């Protein structure tokens, strides 16, 4: 009985430390990203993912970092992870669509735009931008 109470007390004492470490890494990553310290920010977001593997925002920021570092494969991989975790993440769908347009992948871009139209709430104004870029791709 005493062993159980001791275990419960330890868990209660250690749990808040892991939760604060988790948000601490993400917040540090945001600050570093805003200061364009991409390598350091990347490390902080990866640390956040270790503590919270379903942190869609960490994956989203990693994709933005890889975009800035011109690592398109890693950008796409992280955007796909965000969409896997949250299929209604507008920003991830928007960024993945832009990436596919830049890669001249017409069919994927078209599917993503249609998906974007269905779930759009905050970034609906960006749909016109996507459609015009897709039309430019079509005329090439």
Please provide the spans of the model-predicted regions.
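Register position in tetratricopeptide repeats
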Residues: 34-35, 68-69, 102, 133-140
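Canonical tetratricopeptide repeat
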Residues: 61, 95, 129-133
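Terminal, low-structured helical/coil segments at or just beyond the last alpha-helical repeat
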Residues: 110-140
């Amino acid at each position: 009985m005493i062993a159980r109470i001791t275990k419960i007390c330890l868990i209660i004492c250690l749990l808040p430390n892991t939760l604060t470490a988790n948000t601490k890494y993400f917040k540090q990553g945001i600050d570093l990203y805003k200061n364009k310290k991409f390598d350091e920010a990347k490390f902080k977001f990866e640390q956040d993912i270790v503590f919270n593997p379903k942190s869609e925002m960490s994956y989203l920021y990693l994709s933005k970092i890889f975009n800035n570092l011109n690592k398109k494969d890693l950008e796409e991989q992280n955007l796909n992870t965000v969409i896997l975790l949250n299929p209604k993440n507008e920003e991830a769908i928007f960024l993945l669509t832009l990436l596919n347009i830049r890669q001249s992948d017409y069919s994927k871009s078209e599917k993503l735009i249609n998906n974007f139209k269905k779930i759009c709430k905050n970034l609906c104004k960006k749909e016109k931008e996507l459609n015009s870029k897709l039309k430019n791709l079509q005329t090439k």
